[in-house]
Regions:
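All-alpha prenyltransferase/terpene-synthase fold signal
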Residues: 1-258
Length: 258
């Protein structure tokens, strides 16, 4: 089965497990990050798992990520301005998605994976607290917080299957993915918590639309270096990396023209 088919099966499973009529009348449907899903499936293929296990583990990791993202919405400024019932339902939705992944792993009786994911969840939440409370002392610490928020879960998956040589690539790939998302958010809404925090540390106070561009260039350089350390990378993931490089070039032209 090709990677695209595995991705579609996992996304179908996610839709089935997050389907809740009442919640969907009040909240947007959960969003699957296609780049994280591709990276997750790529790791599981590298671990030589069969298709059934790939689908189970990829669905589990994606549900965990959705649960964490959903709970994070409660701290979002726009959510704070919403109704109390929306905030309560958002917490409830996050709990519902969390319960689904516990159920999945319980069915395959993988207690060891539960422990690994619990550590990953703890790391994500600790780094989110430090990020939103702006506890970082410098730009390097901010970038490390974002890397850990984005990559801790998938790195734990890699560690579980003894694929730690992927860690540096995972960090840079998902950091670049997040920077791209933040850039798009900023372009369309003129809002980005990450842009604001990074800009606070800029001594020369760049134009805000230039801040993420600066760090994307640095991340691209690191990603190009670390991809060489992956023994074998599938064509779909390689194409996605190339696409991120191309997106960066296009966005750089947009920034320069703007």
């Amino acid at each position: 089965m090709v990677i695209q088919e595995l991705q579609e099966i996992v996304k179908k499973r996610i839709r089935e497990k997050t389907d809740h009529t009442y919640l969907q009348t009040h909240l947007p449907n959960p969003i699957v990050d296609d780049n994280k899903l591709l990276l997750t499936i790529s790791l599981l293929l590298e671990a030589k798992l069969n298709e059934r296990d790939i689908i189970v583990y990829a669905t589990t990791i994606t549900l965990v990520q959705i649960a964490l993202d959903t709970h994070e919405l409660v701290t979002n400024d726009r959510m704070q301005m919403g109704s109390e019932i929306d905030r309560q339902l958002t917490v409830l939705a996050g709990d519902l998605y969390s319960g689904q992944y516990y159920k999945l792993l319980a069915n395959v009786e993988d207690i060891k994976m539960l422990r690994y994911l619990a550590r990953g969840i703890k790391e994500v939440n600790e780094n989110k607290i430090n990020f939103y409370h702006q506890n970082a002392k410098n730009v390097s610490q901010v970038i490390d917080l974002v890397k850990n928020i984005e990559s801790s879960l998938i790195k734990k998956l890699g560690s579980y299957f003894y694929l730690d040589e992927w860690n540096a690539f995972i960090e840079e790939f998902l950091l670049l993915n997040r920077l791209e998302i933040e850039q798009n958010n900023y372009i369309h809404s003129n809002q980005s918590k990450l842009v604001d925090i990074l800009n606070d540390f800029e001594s020369d106070k760049l134009e805000k639309n230039m801040v993420l561009d600066k760090y994307r260039k640095m991340t691209l350089s690191q990603l190009e270096k670390h991809i060489q350390n992956i023994p074998k990378i599938n064509e779909q993931l390689k194409e996605k990396v190339d696409q991120l490089f191309n997106i960066n070039s296009q966005q750089q032209m947009y920034v320069e023209e703007g």
